[in-house]
Amino acid sequence: MVKIRLTRGGAKKRPFYQIIVTDSRNKRDGRNIERVGHYNPVAQGAESRVVLNVARVEHWVRNGAQLTDKVRSLLKEVSKTQATAS
């Protein structure tokens, strides 16, 4: 099964996550099919907290990919900010 989930990067006490499309059997930080965005939970100042390619996420969901709970909430957050910006 294909999943859209987070993979951790960054440094100790300073996490940074890539939002990736991967097979569910792969390790958390293992191989991925495509990178569709990133999430910085400790963003400060002008740094962006979430960057997500919504069109690619929708493409993968249409083709059967499952979202993890955190990615689903991030997608909702991005959609909300795009709606208010328009």
From Swiss-Prot:
Superkingdom of the organism of origin: Bacteria
Gene Ontology cellular component annotations, sorted alphabetically: cytoplasm; small ribosomal subunit
Molecular function GO labels: structural constituent of ribosome
A Pfam family reported for this protein in Swiss-Prot or TrEMBL: Ribosomal_S16
SUPFAM superfamilies reported in the protein's UniProt record: Ribosomal protein S16 (SSF54565)
Cross-referenced PROSITE patterns: RIBOSOMAL_S16
Ribonucleoprotein found in the keyword field: yes
Signal peptide extent: none
GO biological process, any: translation
Keywords per UniProt: Ribonucleoprotein, Ribosomal protein
Family, similarity comment: Belongs to the bacterial ribosomal protein bS16 family.
Protein name: Small ribosomal subunit protein bS16
Species of the source: Xylella fastidiosa (strain M12)
